[in-house]
Amino acid sequence: MPASQTFTLLLHKQRHRDKRHLLLLTLGVAVAFVFSLSAGDVWLWPSQWSGEAAQLFVWQLRLPRALAVMLVGASLAVAGAVMQSLFENPLAEPGLLGVANGAGVALVLTVLLGNGLLPVAFMSLSAIAGALVMTFLLLSFARRKRLTNARLLLVGVALGIVCSAVMTWAVYFSSSLDLRQLMYWMMGGFGGVDWRQKWLVLALLPVLLWLCCQGKALNFMALGEVQARQLGLSLHLWRNLLVLAIGWLVGVSVALAGVIGFVGLVIPHMLRLSGLTNQRYLLPGCALAGAGVLLAADVVARITLLSAELPIGVVTATLGAPLFIWLLTRVKSLR
């Protein structure tokens, strides 16, 4: 068989395998979504969703929360995958590189300076601005200082620690109950999400869909600067567009649910290890897997304690930290 036919056959098999992965992930998200609507202090299975109790528990309380969880999980996972490609760092992730903390500190300072009287829309925009500033700062370090992967990771962690310290000082010196409640919320949680936050949830959707369709551009960027330019890709323009998209997704996610770590790190790596490496399929796969995993984590956060709720950030950190350590031992290119 000629080499060209062999290559075409292998490419066809790989695409078929990638599409099968996406189908399985879609089925997994559907199961997790149904389970999320059913789980809680009062369990209501699909056969009971037409009853009076379901009108409150399923359609008014759990449905908006489940939709928010899905979109935030998808956004964080896709943002993590794009950051890993953009920074050429296998351990890049919104939480680890301080982007989520940048959004958080902007939100906390807005509440502190505004005495809790500013509208929710303004606070959400401040979170987006904080995420954008942190992402552009990291990108500037990566490009101008020629930092190695390890140094960039350390810079991101250090910036995240500084942001966490600023938030802690702000809470310590504040007598505002809103700010103290906000600090608990910054641990990650969807407890206050209902239909009133639908505009924040919808704000994620167009940017998320656009980013999931940029696999071709990311594949070109992975070839290197010279090859990407030869293929007609404007690297400066695309980097700025991708940074804006990442900042938007992370900022809105933080405004909606607080800081949730490790989703953007673990999900892309798990999918790559399963053989999903083409960015055109990896990004939609990350969206589906991130939605399903965060739905499962949200159910765990809701049902673990009786009449109480764990911060979802605690659940993802408990599961993600061991996986992060394992990934550190596997990534040989981190120098």
UniProtKB/Swiss-Prot annotation:
Q: How does it sit in the membrane?
A: Multi-pass membrane protein
Pfam families named among the record's database cross-references? FecCD
* Keyword vocabulary terms for this entry: Cell inner membrane, Cell membrane, Membrane, Transmembrane, Transmembrane helix, Transport
What role is this protein assigned? Answer: Part of the ABC transporter complex BtuCDF involved in vitamin B12 import. Involved in the translocation of the substrate across the membrane.
Where is this gene product found? Cell inner membrane
| Record keyword Membrane present | yes
Q: Spell out the disulfide connections.
A: none
What does the subunit section of this Swiss-Prot or TrEMBL entry state?
The complex is composed of two ATP-binding proteins (BtuD), two transmembrane proteins (BtuC) and a solute-binding protein (BtuF).
Tell me which GO cellular component terms the UniProt record holds: plasma membrane
UniProt xrefs under SUPFAM superfamilies: ABC transporter involved in vitamin B12 uptake, BtuC
Reply yes or no: does the keyword Cell cycle apply: no
**In which broad location class does this protein mainly occur, judging by the first location in its UniProt entry?**
membrane
Record's protein name: Vitamin B12 import system permease protein BtuC
Family, per entry: Belongs to the binding-protein-dependent transport system permease family. FecCD subfamily.
One GO MF annotation is: vitamin transmembrane transporter activity
The domain of life is: Bacteria
Q: Where are the transmembrane segments?
A: 22-42, 67-87, 94-114, 117-137, 153-173, 200-220, 243-263, 281-301, 308-328
Any one GO BP annotation for this protein = cobalamin transport
